């Protein structure tokens, strides 16, 4: 189907449940698209209002279909003060389970000290965080749709680097951060990253001297990588207990559980990735 028809299903809970049933999915985490609905272009008041509307609708879906949906929420992180207010409302009042954030806001990446109070609050509330970039606006990446095929994975690597090198993962060790698309390129260049810290020990001044690879298992990763070999590397490096199933619904894998099976997963590992780990993260 055309993109418009596919995206239409994303905004119709009954249609999404039909697709879930067809794919053997019991529970889906409702999420606003950070690509389509990224709001850091807006002024702070408009940004907050757009986020509140998205979060209210997510809560409505969960209230109407509590056995089929868990809710995520978006935040106006270009303004950390407003973001903290909406975080408390979304987590405590609406009961939503996952903060759905981008890799950066107006050029400031999520590990920046500006956002450390946000991460402190996230750890205190105990909610999970899913990081999915809004997209790369650099003109070069618009050619050949590279903003999506290459750019997203670059952004995910930059987000992980920001969180590690700026000390977030050291200061707040109980964070539950899920990286979209298997963390992009970051998990696959650890040798080069660690070597650089050996040559430049000043680069790990915020990590207690720990190398980047030390923090790989501090994150969770979704399985939406489209390549069995990439998934195999993630399994070897972080283990099945740090992976959760991703689908890129409604435009990604039509059968995400079947894809995992096709990668050779079975038994306990399949059970963890297909649902067990996510249930633990969400507390359901």
Model-derived regions: residue spans:
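Short acidic/His/Gly/Ser-rich catalytic and metal-binding motifs that mark active-site loops
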Residues: 37-40, 83, 137-143, 253-254
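Mid-domain alpha/beta scaffold segments of enzyme catalytic cores
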Residues: 1-103, 113-114
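Amphipathic, non-transmembrane alpha-helical scaffold segments
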Residues: 47, 51, 55, 157-161, ...
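Mid-to-C-terminal alpha-helical segments outside catalytic/metal-binding sites
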Residues: 1-27, 56-64, 85-89, 175, ...
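Short glycine-enriched loops at secondary-structure junctions
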Residues: 33, 77, 133-137, 249-250
